[in-house]
């Protein structure tokens, strides 16, 4: 075993050797050892009569008979993610970030794995490396720009996709990649503020040092407009996403993290193309004519239905894909049935309930177990200005009318009836009221499966729309015949 990140300071090489001997003995007694080849020595002196520094290149320090390499003026060593040379801390650079992002892009990984590498490893590493008094605002902006460029390449997002979709938290509907430009100044500002307000009077005087005070004022300028704390920064990115073309309605799932679980753990049956389309679906970025950058006269649906070809229109109301949203609905309802049957529920789909006035009701699922009857209707709506809870309460109210309950009691006499609904957003948003159905049926892990099937169904609807509209426009000819 080796002890990492240990630095010994001394006024001369003799004192340094004594410290090195003490450290070697200390670790030896605890079963540890210093590794000379992974260590570095930096010996700096002042040229007599001149204000110039020089470095010793002769080996002055040894561990176990092995010399510790001496650093030259061109060398540096790493400590806690930062680089140091004989003149102090090296100014942070984004070149290493650029190199690591390029490696991730070219790696033989799936898009979901690449996104995880960027979010949880590359960006997280530089969150520490760039926390330096020598960091510049330009370096932070360049770092964010490189990260966004890499994410857009990995996920095939167009240049017009909003930055907020990349930086907003997953719970708020984004991809959860933190903004280094926003977070690093806020983190350093918070740390200096804690030092200034500490109970230790000696530590609190640090901010009275002119250089530290100047840097603190710089951080105050850099954090203007974003709340100054990481919590407020995340909320601000969520607000920007909600106000954008991509994020409208996605915040409805922010009380539960289940709506974005697939971003980190996509289902096994998804291909890389499925994952990319799911990300673009979530951000309202699948190709349509109704995007704001198109002139108004070019936004009409290519199916000829005289409506704006928005993604919500394609997925929910276009006659060209009439049957595919129905199949998506049936797929989600069928999946809920499969899960319920595994838990011992007797399930009947689209039970025909004839009411006293002769009208007919056909709830999607009627489930029976013991003395309990659960009536559940499934609906998939667009995440827009209207909350998903509105659709939920409408469904429950529709099947909670007394004539409907009477028809159910006639079919199942002596049993208690519970009317519930399953409401999903077309982009994979989970309505919190759905927890009533999963709790009643004891389906603790059903949410992810239902959401994934809904997303996959929406992807199929869009693909069929693009295929059918292209076939119509070309008269059935293939792309190579045009």
Swiss-Prot record:
Q: Provide the residue span(s) of the region labelled Nucleic acid-binding endonuclease.
A: 208-482
Catalytic activity reads: DNA(n) + a 2'-deoxyribonucleoside 5'-triphosphate = DNA(n+1) + diphosphate
Which Enzyme Commission number(s) are on file for it? 2.7.7.49
Query: What PROSITE patterns does UniProt report for this protein, alphabetically?
Result: RT_POL
Q: Please state every residue range assigned to the domain named Reverse transcriptase.
A: 1-84
Query: What keywords does the record list, in alphabetical order?
Result: Endonuclease, Hydrolase, Nuclease, Nucleotidyltransferase, RNA-directed DNA polymerase, Transferase, Transposable element
Q: Which GO terms describe its molecular function?
A: endonuclease activity; RNA-directed DNA polymerase activity
Top enzyme category: transferase
Domain of life the protein comes from? Eukaryota
Extract the PANTHER family matched here. Answer: 115 KDA PROTEIN IN TYPE-1 RETROTRANSPOSABLE ELEMENT R1DM-LIKE PROTEIN-RELATED-RELATED (PTHR37557), CCHC-TYPE DOMAIN-CONTAINING PROTEIN (PTHR37557:SF4)
Instruction: Give the protein name, as stated in the record.
Output: Retrovirus-related Pol polyprotein from type-1 retrotransposable element R2
What is the originating organism of this protein? Answer: Popillia japonica
